[in-house]
């Protein structure tokens, strides 16, 4: 029931709010380095030394609370296990990456190849876990159902890898990723309620609760960042939730911000190579472009709060549009 999910969300939020300050104190006590700052964005100079890996707290709390709730309320289903597994395993990849950067002082963290290989392996295992409870190999596009057969395994891998990295790119300024993802997940919570998929709803609401608790300390000026442990987990979670709810196409609208952020990086890199050093944007992902003045030519750009609010509203509006189209068909 919806009430069970709300209870799980509130508990997750409260524990996260209690846990984050202790996590911050641990970072300061151990004198650990924070998330690297961007030299080209002067506004970020004050962020130097800010603790990172805050996603570890809300991910672990969300996982534990949702698992206990699923067992207590009888929602420990194959769909729940699939969502739980993806969220946990993508968090593990992010944790290893952050751990190498923060604790071992290896600036690169995991190499791109290591990270990609790990994501693909988790995608493969996720497919088999999903297939254990769901025999259908159908993807849903509006009112059409397309059976892609064996290629469904490839679709899951690409979907998980793509969205996990897209959300990772979006996590670049205070509060942006946490609330944007919370809004996206709220849209999927609506779909879960309407279709009475309360097993998936339970973990969705738990994660939303964790994000709201984290935002208390992540809004500008952020006292902590989520790190890859949070952003990779959230991206993978969004992707698998859209599949479990048979609403894959909706993520293209609900997650439009993540798509735009990713495309801005791809376009920038391609154009830079093609023109021998010229740029389309001042900096990518595109939220940094707006920080630096956008296309206006001005030296001063949008404040982080303005970028946050515009991106949040954009996500909220497109989420409503996606839901309207989804339920219309």
Curated annotation (Swiss-Prot):
EC number, UniProt record: 2.7.8.13
Coiled-coil ranges from the UniProt annotation: none
Broad enzyme group: transferase
GO process terms (BP): cell division; cell wall organization; peptidoglycan biosynthetic process; regulation of cell shape
Pfam families reported in the protein's UniProt record: Glycos_transf_4 (PF00953), MraY_sig1 (PF10555)
Protein's membrane topology: Multi-pass membrane protein
Family annotation (InterPro entries): Glycosyl_transferase_4, PNAcMuramoyl-5peptid_Trfase, PNAcMuramoyl-5peptid_Trfase_CS
Source taxon at top rank: Bacteria
Name of the featured protein: Phospho-N-acetylmuramoyl-pentapeptide-transferase
The species this protein was found in: Lactococcus lactis subsp. cremoris (strain MG1363)
Name of the gene encoding the protein in the UniProt record: mraY
């Amino acid at each position: 029931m919806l009430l069970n999910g709300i209870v799980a969300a509130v508990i997750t939020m409260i524990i996260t709010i209690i846990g984050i300050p202790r996590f911050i104190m641990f970072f300061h006590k151990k004198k650990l380095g924070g998330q690297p700052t961007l030299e080209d964005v002067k506004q970020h100079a004050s962020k130097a030394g800010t603790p990172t890996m805050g996603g570890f707290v809300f991910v672990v709390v969300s996982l534990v609370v949702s698992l206990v709730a699923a067992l207590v309320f009888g929602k420990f289903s194959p769909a729940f296990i699939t969502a739980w597994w993806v969220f946990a395993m993508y968090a593990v990849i992010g944790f290893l990456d952050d751990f190498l950067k923060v604790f071992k002082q290896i600036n690169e963290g995991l190499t791109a190849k290591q990270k990609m290989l790990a994501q693909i392996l988790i995608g493969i295992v996720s497919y088999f876990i999903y297939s254990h409870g769901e025999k259908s190999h159908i993807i849903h596009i509006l009112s059409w159902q397309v059976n892609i057969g064996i290629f469904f395994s490839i679709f899951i891998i690409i979907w998980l890898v793509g969205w996990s990295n897209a959300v990772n790119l979006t996590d670049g300024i205070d509060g942006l990723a946490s609330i944007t993802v919370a809004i996206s997940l709220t849209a999927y919570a609506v779909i879960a309620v309407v279709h009475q998929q309360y097993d998936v709803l339970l973990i969705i609401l738990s994660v939303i609760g964790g994000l709201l608790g984290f935002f208390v300390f992540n809004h500008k000026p952020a006292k902590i960042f989520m790190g890859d442990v949070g952003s990779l987990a959230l991206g993978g979670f969004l992707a698998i939730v859209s599949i479990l709810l048979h609403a894959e196409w909706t993520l293209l609208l609900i997650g439009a911000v993540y798509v735009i952020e990713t495309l801005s990086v791809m376009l920038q890199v391609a154009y830079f190579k093609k023109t021998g050093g010229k740029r389309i944007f001042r900096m990518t992902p595109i939220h940094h472009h707006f920080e630096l003045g956008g296309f206006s030519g001005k030296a001063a750009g949008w404040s982080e709060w303005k970028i946050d609010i515009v991106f949040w509203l954009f996500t909220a509006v497109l989420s409503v549009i996606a839901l309207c189209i989804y339920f219309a068909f």
